[in-house]
Every structure is written in structure tokens, then in C-alpha cells.
Amino acid sequence: GLFGVLAKVAAHVVPAIAEHF
């Protein structure tokens, strides 16, 4: 569902942000 999509997006966004900081 929508939560699954949100979790997938977060799984990619969080590491990407972590790389910059």
C-alpha cells in the first residue's frame, strides 16, 4: 500500500542524506 511505497522511498532517501552528512 501507500506505506510500503513511503518505506521504499525513505529507504533510498535516508542513505542518500547520510552520504552528504
From Swiss-Prot:
Keywords: Amidation, Amphibian defense peptide, Antibiotic, Antimicrobial, Secreted. Expressed by the skin dorsal glands. GO terms for cellular component: extracellular region. One of its GO terms (biological process) is defense response to bacterium. It comes from the Eukaryota. The keyword Secreted applies. Its main location: secreted. The modification Phenylalanine amide is found at F21. Coiled coil: none annotated. It is found in: Secreted. Maculatin-1.1 shows significant antibacterial activity against Gram-positive bacteria, less against Gram-negative bacteria. Maculatin-1.1.1 is inactive. This is Maculatin-1.1.
